[in-house]
A protein has these predicted regions:
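Short internal beta-strands
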Residues: 31-33, 124-127, 152-158
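Phosphate-binding/switch loop-helix module in NTP-utilizing enzymes
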Residues: 69-107, 114
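Histidine-anchored nucleotide/phosphate-binding helix
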Residues: 22, 114-117, 135-145
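Short, surface-exposed connector motifs at secondary-structure boundaries
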Residues: 26-28, 120-124, 145-152
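C-terminal lobe/tail of nucleotide-utilizing enzymes
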Residues: 141-207
Length: 207
């Protein structure tokens, strides 16, 4: 099973969610494009959070120096991102693929993050409540569905907001996989706790 993790924007909790999914499934992890923070990349963070011995952490297709939209970060580095250079790693394990920002973040003048998503990927959307998050969540899911991509579930990150979550679930008819609370900190034990909570629903996606 291949899961693509996207968010409704930046800093909504994709990397924590990815860590939980990797731990729950003993999956491999791949972040095709990393923009900035190369000394403490998302791959480094997930590797720190995951404790199972099975997971492999695959190399970024592009590791860009500047924390910015990939198209701009690539331009600063003097390169252009090409989709044909983003090659999915081979593995016999489940694979968790983490996107960069939201689905319409540009990679170059023609392609966006959504264009990395393959037909056999199951997409999981991470949503976090803020003013405007309902609109951003509904638009994200609507665009994914318009591309005939498989939206397998939604994860809510942060404090619960029942009014926000209920209208999102009602309008999208997407499965809620779980919630990641605003924890004081995240470490391997906290990630494992959530992995145990999420595992059953995640495994059901592969059936």
């Amino acid at each position: 099973m291949k899961l693509f993790i996207t968010g409704i924007g930046t800093d909504v909790g994709k990397t924590i969610a990815s860590s939980i999914l990797v731990e729950a499934l003993e999956a491999d992890y791949w972040k095709p494009i990393q923009a900035g923070d190369l000394d403490n990349s998302d791959t480094n963070k997930v590797e720190k959070y995951v404790s199972n011995p099975t997971t492999k952490f695959h190399k970024n297709a592009y590791a860009l120096q500047t924390p910015a939209s990939p198209h701009y970060a690539a331009a600063i580095d003097g390169i252009t991102i090409h989709l044909n250079q983003i090659k999915e790693p081979k593995t016999i394990n489940h694979l968790v693929v983490e996107g960069a920002g939201g689905i319409l973040v540009p990679l170059n003048t023609t392609d966006c993050v959504i264009d990395i998503i393959q037909p056999d990927y199951k997409v999981i959307v991470v949503s976090r409540h803020y003013l405007g998050s309902i609109n951003h969540t509904l638009m994200t899911i609507e665009i994914l569905k318009s591309r005939k991509l498989n939206v397998a579930g939604i994860i809510f990150s942060g404090d619960e907001n029942k009014a926000t979550e209920s209208i999102i679930l009602e309008k999208t008819n997407v499965l809620m996989l779980g919630r990641i609370d605003n924890e004081p900190y995240f470490d391997q034990n906290v990630i494992k706790y959530y992995a145990d909570l999420f595992r059953e629903k995640l495994l059901a996606l592969s059936i």
